[in-house]
């Protein structure tokens, strides 16, 4: 059997990276890691608190160190934070060390999925969260596209269907009869 390759999920908040990532890892018998959860675990603080204390720049520096470390592991499905692609280094780590899957979603669907979530520091104090999401999409979507090996829209599919599509696409990419 071939050596397992890493799978990295990128995309905006609310695209389904964590939900799909957990199920994908389970189906492929790989470890699931959420980079934001690792940051919270290591700092003992949630992302919102880190943003409040250190600002976005401080958080992004932490995130870059964690993504560098995690992408060097083998056989993982990694869900990244929505802004991880802002760092050129992160984009390089992700694209060089595994298969990058961009889970694409519309701003409208993002808004629906995130409007009651209080753990979204960039939306917490926003007067117009939908406008914030639109502004983020303009900056980040081209960066997701730049590094994506596979792009999948998540608006109309449930997680199980998405996982099966991803497995099929990876199998086709590898030509290894299901071995990653």
From Swiss-Prot:
The record's SUPFAM superfamilies line, in alphabetical order, gives: P-loop containing nucleoside triphosphate hydrolases
Q: Which reaction does it catalyse?
A: shikimate + ATP = 3-phosphoshikimate + ADP + H(+)
Q: Which organism is it from?
A: Haemophilus influenzae (strain 86-028NP)
Q: Which residues bind Mg(2+)?
A: 18
Q: Name one GO cellular component term.
A: cytosol
- Which residues does substrate bind? 36, 60, 82, 140
Which keywords appear in this protein's UniProt record, sorted alphabetically?
A: Amino-acid biosynthesis, Aromatic amino acid biosynthesis, ATP-binding, Cytoplasm, Kinase, Magnesium, Metal-binding, Nucleotide-binding, Transferase
Read off the Gene3D superfamilies from this record. Answer: P-loop containing nucleotide triphosphate hydrolases (3.40.50.300)
Instruction: List GO BP terms, alphabetically.
Output: amino acid biosynthetic process; aromatic amino acid family biosynthetic process; chorismate biosynthetic process
* Pathway in which this enzyme or protein is active: Metabolic intermediate biosynthesis; chorismate biosynthesis; chorismate from D-erythrose 4-phosphate and phosphoenolpyruvate: step 5/7
Keyword Nuclease assigned to the entry: answer is no
Q: What is this protein called?
A: Shikimate kinase
Gene symbol?
aroK
Q: What class does this enzyme belong to in the EC scheme?
A: transferase
- The EC number(s) this enzyme carries: 2.7.1.71
Which Cys pairs are S-S linked?
none
Q: Which GO molecular function entries does the Swiss-Prot or TrEMBL record give?
A: ATP binding; magnesium ion binding; shikimate kinase activity
The residue ranges crossing the membrane are none
């Amino acid at each position: 059997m071939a050596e397992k390759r890493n799978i990295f999920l990128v995309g905006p908040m609310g695209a389904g990276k964590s939900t799909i990532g957990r199920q994908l890892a389970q189906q492929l018998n790989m470890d699931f890691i959420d980079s934001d959860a690792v940051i919270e675990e290591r700092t003992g603080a949630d992302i919102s608190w880190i943003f409040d204390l250190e600002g976005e720049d401080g958080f992004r520096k932490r995130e870059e160190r964690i993504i560098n470390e995690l992408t060097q592991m083998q056989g993982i499905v990694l869900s990244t934070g929505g802004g991880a692609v802002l760092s050129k280094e992160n984009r390089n780590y992700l694209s060089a060390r595994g298969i990058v899957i961009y889970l694409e979603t519309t701003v409208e669907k993002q808004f629906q999925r995130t409007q009651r979530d209080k753990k979204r520091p960039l939306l917490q104090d926003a007067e117009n969260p939908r406008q914030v999401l639109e502004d983020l999409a303009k900056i980040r979507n081209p960066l997701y596209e730049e590094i994506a090996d596979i792009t999948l829209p998540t608006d109309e599919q449930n997680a199980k269907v998405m996982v099966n599509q991803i497995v099929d696409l990876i199998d086709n990419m590898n030509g290894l009869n299901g071995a990653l």
